[in-house]
Amino acid sequence: MAKLYFYYSAMNAGKTTTLLQSAHNYRERGMRTLILTPKLDHRAGSGVVASRIGLRADGRIFERDTELQQLVERDIHNDGALHCVLVDEAQFLGRAQVWQLSEVVDRLRIPVLCYGLRTDFRGELFEGSQFLLAWADELEEIKTICHSGSKATMTVRVDAHGHAVQDGPQVEIGGNERYVSVSRAEFKKIMRGEGRIDPLQIALPLPVA
């Protein structure tokens, strides 16, 4: 039975790597997939989904007003049977788009796998994540680690000096240089202005020894 899945985490937990591995697993079995990626995230190039460890694949761009059920139906009409839809950066979906993806599952009987952040740099839910948490059939946390050694569940936006940024737009595309995953306790600490966090992390992919 097809289901709507939401795989969520803080930053740098390997969400896109997991998405690309899932897509590969389908293709390896002769099944066709469709990867959707938001237009506003063009860090790897327009329509390219890329992980920090060097994996990449082409995706279909969507915008806030894209009708996703219709997009999927057109894809099937043009290219034939579709076995799975995968959505990168799913936190950027709108409420209506999450509902449309649920229709892909319920009406078209195609599983939809969404990968994204749960909360923003203020600790508040993104719109897409809010409704995926409400409507998905299956929820799974992709875990990552805070510098303190605890599980990281929050994401902090930092400035060049490692201090928390508490103002600004919810959506601001950036990678390791702007965002750091931390535990809830560390999130509270840095948001109070107690200390700083080094935003620099080891560059990936790592060189082969």
Curated annotation (Swiss-Prot):
Transmembrane segments: none annotated. It is an enzyme of class 2 (transferase). One of its GO terms (cellular component) is cytosol. It catalyses: thymidine + ATP = dTMP + ADP + H(+). ATP binds at S9, A10, M11, N12, A13, G14, K15, T16, D88, E89, A90, Q91. Its EC number is 2.7.1.21. It comes from the Bacteria. Keywords: ATP-binding, Cytoplasm, DNA synthesis, Kinase, Nucleotide-binding, Transferase. Pfam families: TK. The active site is at E89 (proton acceptor). InterPro entries: P-loop_NTPase, Thymidine_kinase. It is found in: Cytoplasm. GO terms for molecular function: ATP binding; thymidine kinase activity. The keyword Mitochondrion does not apply. Its main location: cytoplasm. Belongs to the thymidine kinase family. Homotetramer. PANTHER family: THYMIDINE KINASE, THYMIDINE KINASE, CYTOSOLIC. This is Thymidine kinase. It comes from Xanthomonas euvesicatoria pv. vesicatoria (strain 85-10) (Xanthomonas campestris pv. vesicatoria).
